């Protein structure tokens, strides 16, 4: 079960298998007193009867992706946190105090829950090491997660991309080619002009493309020229 959550200008996707739950990003912080974690995600998870998260994945450090993470960590037991955050980031420290296992998103990591396959395609260990030296922009480190499984007698796939940009898209195409093909694509970077290159879209060839962006947002997401490529 995959739920793309309306958090306004930000990203959050809930993935549930028969016995496991993964939350990919936590949306924005709306103000000092309010964020998507407390206002949207915790009420949603509780309404669905979810009492814990097996994995919280934070694609990168931008506030529209991690703004609700503190509230989620404090409000619900979390087993593991995977992210591209630098090791000094406050959310990793918070997770540590709460007894959450912390690990980096690293390309090549795979696991299976209840017959559903998960694989991280990005970032590389080298990119994460460069980020620790302040040599990498957060968007370029976005955790890219591929999900695949069978239900209804058919194979289904989805690709979650964070704020991935064209250069990283090109590397994925060069490395994976047509195996990137996915039925559902979370449109990179909210439909920004920085992303959704033609070669990447040809490789992924999504049947459904989902843009997470706030109504009349100040960034102009999604860009009309990007939508035209879909």
Model regions and ranges:
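Non-globular, low-confidence helical/coil segments that flank catalytic cores
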Residues: 1-230
């Amino acid at each position: 079960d995959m739920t793309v959550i309306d958090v306004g200008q930000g990203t959050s996707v809930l993935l549930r298998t028969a016995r496991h739950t993964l939350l990919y990003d936590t949306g924005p912080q709306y103000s000092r007193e309010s964020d998507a974690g407390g206002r949207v995600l915790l009420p949603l998870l509780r309404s669905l009867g979810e009492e814990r998260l097996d994995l919280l994945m934070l694609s990168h450090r931008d506030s529209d992706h991690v703004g609700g993470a503190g509230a989620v960590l404090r409000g619900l037991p979390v087993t593991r946190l995977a992210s591209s955050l630098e090791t000094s980031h406050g959310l990793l420290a918070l997770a540590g105090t709460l007894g959450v296992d912390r690990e980096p998103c690293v390309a090549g990591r795979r696991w299976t829950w209840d017959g559903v396959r998960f694989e991280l395609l990005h970032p590389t260990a080298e990119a994460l090491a460069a980020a620790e030296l302040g040599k990498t922009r957060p968007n370029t480190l976005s955790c890219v997660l591929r999900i695949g499984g069978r239900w209804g007698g058919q194979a289904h796939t989805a690709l979650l991309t964070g704020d991935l940009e064209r250069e990283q898209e090109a590397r994925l195409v060069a490395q994976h080619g047509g195996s990137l093909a996915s039925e559902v694509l979370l449109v990179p970077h909210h439909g920004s002009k920085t992303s959704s290159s033609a070669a990447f879209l040809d490789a992924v060839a999504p049947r459904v493309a989902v843009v997470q962006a706030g109504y009349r947002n100040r960034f102009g997401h999604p860009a009309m020229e990007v939508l035209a490529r879909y």
